[in-house]
Curated annotation (Swiss-Prot):
Pfam families: UPRTase
GO-annotated cellular components: cytoplasm
UniProt GO BP: UMP salvage; uracil salvage
GO molecular function, one term: uracil phosphoribosyltransferase activity
Gene: upp
EC numbers on record: 2.4.2.9
Record's protein name: Uracil phosphoribosyltransferase
Pathway entry: Pyrimidine metabolism; UMP biosynthesis via salvage pathway; UMP from uracil: step 1/1
Keyword Disulfide bond annotated: no
Residues that coordinate or bind uracil: 194, 199-201
Coiled-coil segments: none
Record-linked InterPro entries: PRibTrfase_dom, PRTase-like, Upp_B, UPRTase/APRTase, Ura_phspho_trans
Length: 209
């Protein structure tokens, strides 16, 4: 069964308050999202597999721990998820980065993939899906389904804020995927926005309406 981890570090909560503030402009918003993503990445990657290696320091030979295997793939959900990638790669520079773009057909309500580029060895990597907001959970759920179809086995979802409705949607569909958030917010409003939330993350990141 998946678990939900709220990373309530003082620095994360401070920066999240600035992100929520409607008076925070796009430049500061982008920088803050990257910073929070980097801080969250420390906890999200806590259980990555390690191997023992022997190295030689200027003094002597010794045994140390290093990451094992193919390491990490970061997969943002376009477009808002892109805002979290810089913070992640600053901490994990060797990570591969994939991209997933989805929209919902207005008639069938089924997800339509309009863009998908993933590392060829996605099945061998620990995959971290990024999206600043987990609202209804539809996009995240569909992106994770697509990743599994492409061979991904070890997936975790990382969001800044999440509504309980979105968390339930993802957990019901993907009980094997752990969810990491900076805040579990109150609810969704009638327009499907997270309350109190942070507005439209994509628009605030890129200065669009």
């Amino acid at each position: 069964m998946s678990k939900v981890t709220q990373i309530a570090h003082p620095l994360i909560l401070h920066k999240l308050a600035l992100i929520r503030d409607k008076n925070t402009g796009s430049k500061d918003f982008r920088e803050l999202v990257e910073e929070v993503a980097m801080l969250m990445a420390y906890e999200v990657t806590r259980d990555l597999q390690l191997k023992e290696v022997e190295i030689e320091t200027p003094i002597c030979k010794t045994k140390c721990k290093m990451l094992s295997g193919k390491k990490v793939a970061i997969v943002p959900i376009l477009r808002a998820g892109l805002g979290m990638v810089g913070g992640m790669t600053s901490l994990i520079p060797a990570a591969k980065v994939g991209h997933i773009g989805l929209y919902r057909d207005e008639e069938t309500l089924k997800p339509v993939e309009y863009f998908c580029k993933l590392p060829q060895d996605i099945g061998d990597r620990d995959v971290i899906v990024t999206d600043p907001m987990l609202a209804t959970g539809g996009s995240a759920k569909d992106a994770i389904t697509l990743l599994k179809q492409k061979g991904a086995k070890h997936i975790r979802l990382m969001c800044l804020v999440a509504a309980p409705e979105g968390i339930k949607e993802v957990m019901d569909e993907h009980p094997d995927v752990d969810i990491y958030v900076a805040s579990v917010d109150e609810k969704l409003n009638e327009k499907g926005y997270v309350v109190p939330g942070l507005g439209d993350a994509g628009d605030r990141l890129y200065g669009t309406k």
